[in-house]
């Protein structure tokens, strides 16, 4: 696997379909080695979830949307929250992606948990933010919170992602 550069990412963002759409400011969000993804919505997690081998018993945790204040800010107490991103990704069958939190989150006592973005996946992804700071953490709507790193696969996958999260949150 080879990590894509800013130049390669720009070409793919401008392609049809775009690698990443609904960007707030492409020039700001395109970084030397990835695309910064932004905050659309935060939800609480207030019920248990479940996962099994064949997904017959899968149950997603329920939660409520936390509203931004009149200035566009949310204060998060220590804990775990779901995050919905602004951007929609359209990953071709010769790429995959992984995400890392922006270092500012870590310096403030918060981090993100994410999964792999599979070749062929399209959708508006969710991830999890964990606030470790005992005093909490403040986030503004549209804040750049993660960097999505795209990797070129040695060969294109025969069949791209086709799971239940395909085209999610669009």
From Swiss-Prot:
Q: Which Gene3D superfamilies match?
A: 2.70.40.10
Question: Which BP terms in the Gene Ontology apply to this protein?
Answer: dUMP biosynthetic process; dUTP biosynthetic process
What's one GO MF term for it? dUTP diphosphatase activity
Per the database entry, which stretches of residues form a coiled coil? Answer: none
This enzyme catalyses:
dUTP + H2O = dUMP + diphosphate + H(+)
Pfam family, any one: DCD
Q: Which UniProt keywords apply?
A: Hydrolase, Nucleotide metabolism
Q: State which Enzyme Commission number(s) the record gives.
A: 3.6.1.23
Q: Which domain of life is it from?
A: Archaea
UniProt KW Kinase keyword = no
Q: Pathway listed for it?
A: Pyrimidine metabolism; dUMP biosynthesis; dUMP from dCTP (dUTP route): step 2/2
Supply the InterPro entries for this chain. Answer: dCTP_deaminase, dUTPase-like_sf, dUTPase_archaeal, dUTPase_trimeric
User: Top EC class per UniProt?
Assistant: hydrolase
Which residues belong to the signal peptide in this entry? none
Q: Tell me, what does this protein do in biology? A: This enzyme is involved in nucleotide metabolism: it produces dUMP, the immediate precursor of thymidine nucleotides and it decreases the intracellular concentration of dUTP so that uracil cannot be incorporated into DNA.
Could you tell me which PANTHER family the record lists for this protein? Answer: DCTP DEAMINASE, DEOXYURIDINE 5'-TRIPHOSPHATE NUCLEOTIDOHYDROLASE
| NCBIfam families, alphabetized | PRK02253.1 (NF002598)
Q: Which family does it belong to?
A: Belongs to the dCTP deaminase family. Archaeal dUTPase subfamily.
Protein name per the record = Probable deoxyuridine 5'-triphosphate nucleotidohydrolase
The species is Methanococcoides burtonii (strain DSM 6242 / NBRC 107633 / OCM 468 / ACE-M)
Q: Encoded by which gene?
A: dut
């Amino acid at each position: 696997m080879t990590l894509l550069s800013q130049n390669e990412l720009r070409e793919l963002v401008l392609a049809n379909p775009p690698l990443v759409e609904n960007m707030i400011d492409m020039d700001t969000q395109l970084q030397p080695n990835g695309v910064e993804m932004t905050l659309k919505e935060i939800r609480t997690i207030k019920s248990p979830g479940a996962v099994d081998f064949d997904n017959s018993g899968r149950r997603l945790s329920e939660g409520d949307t936390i509203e931004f204040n009149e200035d566009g800010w949310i204060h998060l107490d220590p804990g775990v929250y779901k995050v919905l991103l602004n951007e929609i990704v359209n990953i071709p069958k010769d790429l995959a992606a992984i995400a890392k939190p922006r270092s500012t989150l870590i310096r403030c006592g918060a981090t993100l948990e994410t999964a792999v973005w599979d070749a062929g996946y399209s959708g508006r992804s969710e991830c999890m933010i964990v606030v470790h700071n005992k005093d909490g953490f403040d986030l503004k709507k549209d804040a750049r919170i993660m960097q999505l790193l795209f990797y070129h696969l040695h060969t294109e996958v025969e069949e791209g992602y086709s799971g239940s999260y395909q085209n999610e949150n669009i």
